[in-house]
Amino acid sequence: MPEMVFGLLTGTLFPLAIIGAIIYAIVQWRRRQAPLESIDPGIGTVRRLYFYVVSLVALIVAANGLVQIERYVLEGLFGGDVLSPSRGGLAVGISLAVVGLPIWGFHWRLVQRHVTELPVEVRSIVRKLYVYVLLGVSVGFLLASSVSALQWIFGAKDFSGYPWAFLTIWAGVWAYHWRLESSEGQPTVETLAIRRLYVYAASLATLV
């Protein structure tokens, strides 16, 4: 399962990051063509990048910590005598969750406060990239975990708590951010383009 996690991160997160960098460069070029009066910087690009990058990394760390914890519980309940859950994995999971959750919660609370105080933040290209990178990573984990879960259901693999833990935790991450994005919408051409890229990429991934 660690190989699956690494493969999903390299196969999903990095391409989305490259796409995001391209979109960000295009947006900056377009802004240079626009009158300065029409630009509302909000909290500023540097601060915005800091908050969203830290939130992204912290949430991924916390979510995978929760996956380790749930995997330990599931294998203890349903693994039987053959499958003995590792306490080392549980310790790692608790450590990741204890570190990641407070960091994400603190930074995300500040991000949401900025959005409330400065409505221009809703149109931020960085915010949309944060949301859709997480949606993309979630879809990658969900697809791979669904395959593993179905293999166990049809008797092709022994029971493992990992697929079910990934399914429940990352489904929650996906649902939260999808609901958030649906409520905010896509107020600019650039943010709509990011949504379209996500939809096309997710559709292609399900076909593959």
Residue spans of the language-model regions?
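Hydrophobic/aromatic interaction determinants used to assemble and anchor large protein complexes
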Residues: 1-208
